[in-house]
UniProtKB/Swiss-Prot annotation:
GO BP field: CTP biosynthetic process; GTP biosynthetic process; UTP biosynthetic process
Enzyme class: transferase
Organism this protein belongs to: Shouchella clausii (strain KSM-K16) (Alkalihalobacillus clausii)
Keyword set, alphabetical order: ATP-binding, Cytoplasm, Kinase, Magnesium, Metal-binding, Nucleotide metabolism, Nucleotide-binding, Phosphoprotein, Transferase
InterPro entries xref list: NDK-like_dom, NDK-like_dom_sf, Nucleoside_diP_kinase, Nucleoside_diP_kinase_AS
PTM sites of type Phosphoserine: S122
Protein name in UniProt: Nucleoside diphosphate kinase
Subcellular compartments: Cytoplasm
Function, in words: Major role in the synthesis of nucleoside triphosphates other than ATP. The ATP gamma phosphate is transferred to the NDP beta phosphate via a ping-pong mechanism, using a phosphorylated active-site intermediate.
Taxonomy of the source species: Bacteria, Bacillati, Bacillota, Bacilli, Bacillales
């Protein structure tokens, strides 16, 4: 079954948005495979965002993402990688459609409340950064038969 990495960023944790964000994935019909509140080290943050190493905002991005705890999650279900990106909305919240997480809950491109893996390769890489294999729960929910 397909899995993706989703993370409530420090601004989302500070603004009490964990429940709101988790709820959207649950209501859509996805299954939570793993979750934890964790404060990223500079090294982990740089590894996670390594594709942006050369970008002018990299320092700011790493400093922001390590500024407080994040809520790290693995979500599972049919087409979840692409669907998570759709639920999250455009990178810049000012361009994100209403109804999406960023469209509803954020204003600033730097503080856009949530991260979601952008491809199957990224999902696999990012899940491995944050979770050990034994932390990934493999279970069925009865409600899955309705979605
Ligand atoms: P994320 O990785 O955090 O889920 O966001 P994303 O895929 O929608 O966007 P991405 O291109 O991967 O950028 C990663 C994060 O860098 C910050 N950013 N700032 N100042 C800027 O122009 C700028 N561009 C990107 C954003 O916080 C974005 O989420
Ligand atoms: Mg990205």
């Amino acid at each position: 079954m397909e899995r993706t990495y989703v993370m409530v960023k420090p601004d989302g944790v500070q603004r009490n948005l964990i429940g709101n964000i988790v709820s959207r994935f649950e209501q859509k019909g996805y299954t939570l495979a793993a979750a934890k509140l964790v404060t990223l080290s500079k090294e982990t943050a740089e590894t996670h965002y390594s594709e942006h190493r050369e970008r002018p905002f990299f320092g700011e991005l790493v400093s922001f993402i390590t500024s407080g705890p994040v809520f790290a999650m693995v979500w599972e279900g049919e087409g979840v990688i692409k669907a998570a990106r759709q639920l999250i909305g455009a990178t810049n919240p000012s361009e994100a459609a209403p109804g999406t997480i960023r469209g509803d809950l954020a204003v600033n491109v730097g503080m856009n409340v949530v991260h979601g893996s952008d491809s199957p390769e990224s999902a696999e890489r990012e899940i491995a950064i944050f979770f050990k294999e034994e932390e990934l729960n493999d279970y069925q929910k009865d409600s899955n038969k309705w979605v």
